[in-house]
Amino acid sequence: MESIEQRVKKIVAEQLGVNEAEIKNESSFLDDLGADSLDMVELVMALEDEFETEIPDEEAEKITTVQQAIDYINSHGKQ
């Protein structure tokens, strides 16, 4: 079974059209991976679907790196 980290990276790769190998935990969605605000909304929705959780807007705004997404899912998502 894939880890949360692997699943998050796979979703990021699919949503942002980047190679999964290029995605580092410290990668910034906006600065390093080329996401824009619409990409971020779609990414949050994909994470919510995958991990059966709801990410409030005020929390979603704080998720700017891959590691922050992983940490949030570890704390709030269904494994």
Swiss-Prot record:
Pathway: Lipid metabolism; fatty acid biosynthesis. The keyword Cytoplasm applies. The modification O-(pantetheine 4'-phosphoryl)serine is found at S37. It comes from the Bacteria. Belongs to the acyl carrier protein (ACP) family. NCBIfam families: acyl_carrier (TIGR00517), PRK00982.1-2 (NF002148), PRK00982.1-3 (NF002149), PRK00982.1-4 (NF002150), PRK00982.1-5 (NF002151). This is Acyl carrier protein. It comes from Bordetella avium (strain 197N).
